[in-house]
């Protein structure tokens, strides 16, 4: 890519926004040019707006410290200088849906970390190794929004991203029953040990809302685009997922243990072979973050 894409971060002062900032530092493809947050933060430098709330394990990158934060509610102005937006905004779901659609209607693509649009039928919820063909639904979404370039795409819940690629690799063996336990870091709750000291040496065996997401979202990921309806139809085959989601005293990184029953017999050697040799359309793109 000869010229970097200019990107903005909506919700830049929060923990997910901070993670975007660290991930995009010195990125060969993207240049962060706009940091948007609440009206309370607008007009301040990023360092002033965040203050002592920087939660990353590495220092705040120099490139953002003196950038002036803009009001994320002013979608037209914020979007005018970017090629697309990363959304990490933290607000009620209906407000997230509304503001992300406002940005899309400025003809700005929105890539969202939020859950608000995950079940909007014409919004793709993508795990690149599994379902990049779901991007085809964007054509229908644009018709609904009245846009030619703007759209919304989302990522799924963080708890399913570790194990769903394995299910895709073993698709030929027809996974029928999945029993998964996830052990989720406190960063998933937007916390560090500094502001959640009760988690040191502690385990919480239930995370509100996570089990429903872990059981239902894979069905949309494994679904298909219905061109006639202009939406993604969740997988309705013989697949049952049961989950338990546990908060553990780890700062970053989730772990999942998965027990599977298949419709077709498979040997250990066959399962290993399919994992090792699994490829997808995403593999052809040579993405910087692709697993090697």
Where are the regions that the model predicts?
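N-terminal Rossmann-like NAD(P) cofactor-binding subdomain of oxidoreductases
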Residues: 1-206, 239-240, 268, 273, ...
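Short, well-ordered beta-strand elements within core beta-sheets of diverse protein domains
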Residues: 87, 256-263
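A short beta-turn/strand-edge loop motif at beta-sheet boundaries
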Residues: 211, 266-267
